[in-house]
From Swiss-Prot:
Family assignment from sequence similarity: Belongs to the RNase PH family.
Function: Phosphorolytic 3'-5' exoribonuclease that plays an important role in tRNA 3'-end maturation. Removes nucleotide residues following the 3'-CCA terminus of tRNAs; can also add nucleotides to the ends of RNA molecules by using nucleoside diphosphates as substrates, but this may not be physiologically important. Probably plays a role in initiation of 16S rRNA degradation (leading to ribosome degradation) during starvation.
Entry protein name: Ribonuclease PH
GO molecular function terms listed in the Swiss-Prot or TrEMBL record: 3'-5'-RNA exonuclease activity; RNA binding; tRNA binding; tRNA nucleotidyltransferase activity
SUPFAM superfamilies for this protein: Ribonuclease PH domain 2-like (SSF55666), Ribosomal protein S5 domain 2-like (SSF54211)
Disulfide bonds listed in the record: none
Organism, scientific name: Thermodesulfovibrio yellowstonii (strain ATCC 51303 / DSM 11347 / YP87)
Residues binding phosphate, per UniProt: 86, 124-126
Protein's UniProt keywords contain Methyltransferase: no
Keywords: Nucleotidyltransferase, RNA-binding, rRNA processing, Transferase, tRNA processing, tRNA-binding
Lineage, top ranks: Bacteria, Pseudomonadati, Nitrospirota, Thermodesulfovibrionia, Thermodesulfovibrionales
Catalytic reaction annotation: tRNA(n+1) + phosphate = tRNA(n) + a ribonucleoside 5'-diphosphate
Self-association and partners: Homohexameric ring arranged as a trimer of dimers.
Amino acid sequence: MRPDGRKNDELRPIKIEKNFIKNADGSVLIELGNTRVICTASIENKVPPFLKDQKKGWITAEYGMLPRSTPVRMLRESTSGRVGGRTHEIQRLIGRTLRAVVDLEKLGERTIWIDCDVIEADGGTRTASITGGYIALVEAVKKAMNAGMITENPIKDSIAAISVGIVLGEPRLDLCYAEDSQAEVDMNIVMTGSGKFIEIQGTAEIYPFSKENLLQLLSLAEKGIREIIRVINNLD
């Protein structure tokens, strides 16, 4: 029995509220169960120095957690004066997965910043950030196209992400924190709406896993991501 009574192949309830931050070019509040993340997209009419005069854009991300997004208050990373290794890894993950579905030349010499702020953490914050970041990106691009800043839609495909793992010997979809903290195997999967993989992060936390286990987890993730993509496609 899972902590919240779900079946092993069942997602947590998903809620998505677009235009959550009025000042942003695109924004969303995404909820998967008790995990809640605010994602915004901001367009700048400049690119990093390494892309100067290359006539293409860039997408980058920042990720953070509120001090009381966790049961015990955590320190803000700004207090320590540096970004931690986990945060840096997640920021790079969000940026590169979103770039995989964007034609950067059609974006023009612009940078889109994706900011993901976790306001409540109960497992799957990085995957929720990727999915929410994609929705915020789409909204920002729509706004830019309506304003005539971008003439062609640079987004080539939809994207979503989910966690899977083996807990107490059972493959499970969309792990909450209680499951994630005791998982024997933990994976984060990112896929496109057309069914292609962008990222597969998998780790044996306790025991090595077999090829059969891997295929079971990939199949679970694919099922969950298809369901999330359907939710995204049905948004107003």
